[in-house]
């Protein structure tokens, strides 16, 4: 997540006018989370309005009584344990005697019905009692209490939240990515995250923090509406106590665990603003694959987790998808950028490689340790210089790429371990290696190198005929040729055993140019024609419409003029999906764009090529207005969206938009699923 409008400082300034606005918005009804966020802007919530805000944030406002159909019988095998835990909890709350019995029945009923409806066995270790504490303080009726509890469990408590569970293996990888020294210290003591953070995650800090602090954390967390954000809050708690933890080298494992487990208890209300600001910063420095590859941990899903993906306990480090690697280094300004290190043998690298990748032959680690050490030194210097010079190959984040074949990547894993032992932060591995890169480029390739994707692969051996050796001299401008020349020189330099290898590599990086604007005349500004397709697009056998006329009338002048920061919009908490694409006009011209999907709308941001990192809001369409999504057999990546109204008399088309979307199948599937959710919500 990036800084900006998605999470503003938790300040108390601004008088009480915003509180009146919030109260009026809540009283008016029909208020959504985005409206609330715009009013609240990260400020502490008034206690009397918290219940209404949380219900909207949890999407249970106006929801019916889920317990209405239940007979109310408390007869689970573990009922005595449930009753005992609830009774102890009520005693801790110091509830007036006349209300205690009713509250006890509410809590016991909520837990019992949840267990019955979800076929879950209760145990004290689950932290459910603590999770209910901040909700009980809202003094909700039983039906709302259950709905809120269910929503929190469903959206914010990850699957397998148990000892040795997958969520904690993932947390260890996040710690290692940002704080390798701390991770190494805990690993040495054989302290795993589940041993101290089980109740952090299982209760969303309610187990250890005071009610006031817990409510303040939940105020921000529920408005953030990002279940993964809890990982960064947990990370900051560790980071803030890092020096104390590292000083406990002589303490026993049990003593360190006890200290770690209780650290959230020291939080007070004044700490919350800094906690969220720091979490936001670390969040912005984390690859998007951290979320995307583990999205199934949260929410309702019928999809199983593949065995080979599930064992994060065996992962060397955080994995990053090849699609993110390609997209990240096209970003301008803020955001995660990767310095890709290709660890395959020289002959494989020469046959074909990612054009921006630095070659580090992992075989050297055993065959020639001194040359390997020199190459590593050169690599780190080259990374530094590439960042300073603004090279498109530059990035703070080291991503190692192997072949994708386990037996061949053994040496690369040793290289990875070497960097991790040196406590190098921001170390990741490319998921699936070069094989996955080849497959991804094949999937998004439209019509060979001329489509604009061929420039991603470079070759230093002159071989041709497969995607691993796509012609490097595609017509992508002088800076692409310069990039390939740079990679070739780096490869030759790294093969040289001369002591001057470091200086050579650095000079090559320094002499590389940053991407330049390709507009050379006013005629170029209308976009690049989509090759191989006639100016008038027909999708399958669909009827044609005068889309230029529709396009020009489908948005206001104000919309067309609004300029936004692309990365800020992509990282908004309500953005569920982001698809880099090209908007295709009837003239055949294409414009680099981004499709962003929220719970209810789809936005098209068209890049402003003369203002890097900025875009116009080209269109904003309600998902429930999509009446048809079609593609062409010869060009399945070319997707047409038709918007309008459906009625008994037929479909009235009001707007048509066409996009060239890499991995179009994934994009349309995600959009269709979101449309169905909108329609289901409207029907209910």
Curated annotation (Swiss-Prot):
Gene3D superfamilies reported for this sequence: Rhodanese-like domain, Ypt/Rab-GAP domain of gyp1p, domain 3
Gene: Tbc1d23
Broad class of where this protein is predominantly found: Golgi
Domain Rhodanese residue range list: 334-446
Positions of the UniProt region annotated as May mediate the interaction with C17orf75, FAM91A1 and WDR11: 514-558
Cellular component GO terms held in the UniProt record: cytoplasmic vesicle; cytosol; trans-Golgi network
Official protein name in the record: TBC1 domain family member 23
Primary role: Putative Rab GTPase-activating protein which plays a role in vesicular trafficking. Involved in endosome-to-Golgi trafficking. Acts as a bridging protein by binding simultaneously to golgins, including GOLGA1 and GOLGA4, located at the trans-Golgi, and to the WASH complex, located on endosome-derived vesicles. Together with WDR11 complex facilitates the golgin-mediated capture of vesicles generated using AP-1. Plays a role in brain development, including in cortical neuron positioning.
